[in-house]
UniProtKB/Swiss-Prot annotation:
Together with the chaperonin GroEL, plays an essential role in assisting protein folding. The GroEL-GroES system forms a nano-cage that allows encapsulation of the non-native substrate proteins and provides a physical environment optimized to promote and accelerate protein folding. GroES binds to the apical surface of the GroEL ring, thereby capping the opening of the GroEL channel. GO terms for molecular function: ATP binding; metal ion binding; protein folding chaperone; protein-folding chaperone binding; unfolded protein binding. It is found in: Cytoplasm. It comes from Caulobacter sp. (strain K31). The keyword Chaperone applies. This is Co-chaperonin GroES. GO terms for biological process: chaperone cofactor-dependent protein refolding. The gene is groES. Heptamer of 7 subunits arranged in a ring. Interacts with the chaperonin GroEL. Belongs to the GroES chaperonin family. InterPro entries: Chaperonin_GroES, Chaperonin_GroES_sf, Chaprnonin_Cpn10_CS, GroES-like_sf. Its main location: cytoplasm. Keywords: Chaperone, Cytoplasm.
């Protein structure tokens, strides 16, 4: 299934966190926090401004982003667990 977000929404795949600490301790799923970093899978066309013109988003597919702890709605697309959120929920782009 092909999924295209509407408006200023962004489809994000969470980046998996390490399951083991540097000291070798394995972190069980019950105490792990969900990662707040992800990769943008797809973006909508943008939000409309006061004049009705579409303003393109700052993020694009392939960007690695940081987002708030409670941001987005969890969805399942083609068997993958993804998040859909507004661009305003994105805190920033991680640059290499």
């Amino acid at each position: 299934m092909k999924f295209r977000p509407l408006g200023d929404r962004v489809l994000v795949k969470r980046v998996e966190e390490e399951t083991k600490t540097k000291g070798g301790i394995i972190i069980p799923d019950t105490v792990k926090e969900k990662p707040q970093e992800g990769e943008v899978v797809a973006v909508g066309p943008g939000a409309r401004n006061d004049k009705g013109d579409i303003v393109a988003l700052d993020v694009k597919a392939g960007d690695r982003i940081l987002f708030g702890k409670w941001s987005g709605t969890e969805v399942k697309v083609d068997g993958q667990d993804l998040l859909i959120m507004k661009e305003s929920d994105v805190l920033g782009i991680v640059e290499a």
